[in-house]
Amino acid sequence: MTPMGHSLIGLSFASLALSTSKNATNHRWRNCGVALTFVALANLPDWPLPNWGHDRYDVSHSIFVNAGLICTVIAVMKTLATGKWFSQPRFLMLAAMAWLSHLLLDSFYNHGNGIAIYWPVSSQRLNLAIPWFSNWDLSQPVTSPDNLSVFGIEFLAYTPILLGSLLVSYEIRNRRALDEA
């Protein structure tokens, strides 16, 4: 999978998180920061960190490892940022969902390996391969026809989800404006 699919899903969760903020339209820089944070969270298991195991889809794609990290981050956020808009339960839940969406999306790809979602408890791999989803070939240029095809398929598959979340976010803001009027 490419970062495009993960990023589009991260933006989808960011739009929903921002719809819960009362003054989201008045804080453009904050909104950009939230969007970038959610995109980073959605791509986090693929970050090239030492001993992270991304190339094997084990440590970095384990539900146990990621859930433990998410719980740690939430505990820190709740402790250090008590009362701030970004420490609210709905915002933190959407951030966690953006992070965990990575595991589900990677299981859709047709590389045949699956992901070791239950590592270290089990060596079983989750493989929900969808035939038209494939990985990009890093040995080829990013602009090669095969890689552009992978990007295009991801764009077509995940953009409707982003558009749907933007529509839901718009409706939430409109209802809030009507309730306040």
Residue ranges and their predicted role:
Residues M1-A181:
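N-terminal membrane-targeting hydrophobic helices
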